[in-house]
């Protein structure tokens, strides 16, 4: 019943999304849409907010995503390309022929013979304006048998019925929990971390919440694990560190 980002314009009133049998949704910053459970097309039971993209879970366990895809958070196994443009330097900022270009964490500048350049995301694959099925591991098939979803910042995570978890998107702070810090445009399986050093992947996950720079998961036994940025002790493991790239117990 409510529309997030399916065109290039802001939407000031609720609009239907072309999806059926949805049981959960996790939406981007600025959206708090409690959808009507009796709606003939959408059957949404809960929603929460994150940052720039939207996840939806249907009754068959498939995950759908749309919106901003600058970090691969839509999970389509497609990367956003960057284009180089030349900028003139002024005391007020960097400008090109079209005017001032504001800074962004995605942009980088180089100095070469008194010429400044910046790299900006191209429009190709940057915005996914229609609900798109999230691909499976290694880009094969699609995620399935999913019971929980959460979108946070520019990252996404899902829990499968068998207790395994998968994350994709921004990984600057290790919030995908795959032991790395590289962004991923397709799901990466969550490592076991300190839960069980004798197995590779996390098992028995029940609920999950992806924040802007870290994530938290609860198990069927009531244990809580977290991973990602920890400069402010947000992982709750009794320590502070730059980041943890796999789960640690709270």
Which residues does each PLM region occupy?
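Eukaryote-biased RCC1-like beta-propeller repeat architecture
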Residues: 1-250
């Amino acid at each position: 019943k409510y529309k997030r980002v399916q065109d290039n314009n802001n939407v000031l009133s609720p609009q239907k999304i072309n999806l059926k049998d949805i049981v959960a949704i996790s939406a981007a910053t600025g959206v708090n849409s409690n959808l009507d459970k009796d709606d003939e097309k959408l059957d949404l039971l809960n929603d929460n907010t994150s940052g720039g993209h939207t996840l939806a879970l249907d009754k068959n366990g498939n995950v759908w995503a749309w919106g901003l895809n600058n970090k691969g958070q839509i999970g389509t196994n497609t990367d956003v390309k960057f284009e180089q443009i030349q900028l003139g330097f002024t005391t007020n900022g960097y400008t090109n022929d079209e005017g001032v270009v504001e800074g962004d964490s995605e942009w980088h500048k180089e100095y070469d013979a008194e010429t400044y350049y910046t790299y900006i995301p191209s429009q190709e694959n940057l915005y996914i304006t229609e609900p798109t099925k999230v691909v499976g591991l290694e880009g094969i098939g699609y995620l399935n048998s999913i019971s929980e979803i959460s979108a946070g910042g520019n990252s996404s995570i899902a829990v499968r019925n068998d207790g395994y978890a998968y994350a994709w998107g921004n990984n600057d702070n290790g919030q995908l929990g795959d032991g790395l810090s590289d962004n991923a445009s397709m799901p990466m399986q969550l490592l076991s971390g300190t839960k069980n050093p004798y197995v590779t992947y996390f098992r028995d996950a029940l609920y999950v919440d992806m924040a802007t720079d870290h994530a938290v998961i609860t198990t069927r036994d009531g244990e809580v694990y977290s991973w990602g940025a920890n400069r402010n002790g947000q992982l709750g493991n009794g320590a502070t560190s730059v980041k943890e790239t796999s789960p640690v117990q709270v």
